[in-house]
Amino acid sequence: MHNDTKAMDFNRKAKVAISERDSIDGWPCCVYCGAASPAPLAWSNAHFISRGQGGLGVPENGLTLCPVCHRRYDQSDERERMRDFFREYLQHCYEEWSEDALIYRKGGNDD
């Protein structure tokens, strides 16, 4: 697996962090519609900034989305409205959240 591909995948540690962050009463739920996940790590795999745009596989770029909301985010004309909602959600979760820090850069992201 190439380093860039690895950097954009959510590893188990990231999936657990996303799942815990997006939980209600200890159970992961879709952050958009509120549906409960069928299993603890089943839905912790949506990128705020897509892999195709270089989005990193880090919790700050991850969202728990049900399959319906994930498809709507990836493939519908609702993307911009949903993206605004997710941006506010992630900014609320992480004090120093920045979209620029979520994009893979060859050679590292600490510049």
Regions found by a protein language model. Name each.
Residues 29-64, 81:
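Histidine-centered nuclease catalytic patch
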Residues 22-25, 37, 94:
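A broad structural signal for alpha-helix termini and local helix breaks/kinks
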Residues 2, 52-64, 71-111:
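Polybasic, low-complexity binding patches
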Residues 47, 69-70:
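Histidine-centered divalent metal-coordination motifs
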Residues 10, 27, 48, 85-86:
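Phenylalanine-focused residue identity feature
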Residues 35-36, 70-72:
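Detector for the c-type heme attachment site
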Residues 1-29, 56:
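Short, charged surface segments at domain edges that flank catalytic/cofactor-binding sites
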